[in-house]
């Protein structure tokens, strides 16, 4: 996997990463974020969990060491999530893990940026910029806004 760069912003701007670019052959990824909470929605088998797995390698680099991952295999999910500060939190299988208490935590936790692989967004404070889908064009993967005005 080859890093192409990550543009970080200060926490006061509420985005830990504004952009994450990298290559994982045969694909190149250019992921741009416009909101503190980003939902990646879509049907099964569209690459969401694959992207989550790529983040597990990417977070080992100096450039992307603020990435923290959670999924259904995470022990003590609730207590571990509450400990995380100033990070880019990625949660896979959010429909299984995220209940109303976690949604409230995410809403009021201004120190972290969240990337959620989640279908049910009821209870989250979101903007239209929060709703995204993975988009593939040739071997280039991006996150596109779901609602374009």
Task: Label each PLM-derived region with a short phrase.
Residues 2-29:
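N-terminal pre-Walker A segment at the start of P-loop NTPase domains
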Residues 30-35:
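Phosphate-binding P-loop
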Residues 51-52:
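Post-Walker A alpha-helix
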Residues 73-123:
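Conserved nucleotide-sensing/catalytic segment adjacent to the nucleotide-binding pocket
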């Amino acid at each position: 996997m080859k890093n192409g760069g990550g543009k970080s912003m200060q926490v006061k701007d509420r985005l830990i990463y504004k952009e994450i670019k990298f290559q994982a052959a045969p694909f190149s990824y250019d992921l741009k974020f416009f909101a503190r909470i980003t939902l990646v929605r879509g049907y099964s088998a569209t690459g969401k969990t694959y992207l989550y797995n790529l983040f597990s390698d990417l977070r080992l680099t100096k450039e992307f060491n603020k990435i923290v991952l959670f999924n259904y295999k995470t022990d003590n999910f609730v207590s571990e999530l509450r400990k995380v500060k100033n990070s880019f939190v990625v949660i896979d299988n959010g429909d299984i893990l995220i209940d109303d208490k976690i949604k409230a935590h995410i809403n009021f936790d201004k120190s972290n940026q969240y990337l959620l692989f989640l279908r049910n967004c009821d209870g989250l404070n979101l903007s239209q910029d929060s709703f995204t889908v993975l988009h593939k064009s040739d071997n280039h993967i991006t996150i596109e806004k779901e609602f374009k005005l």
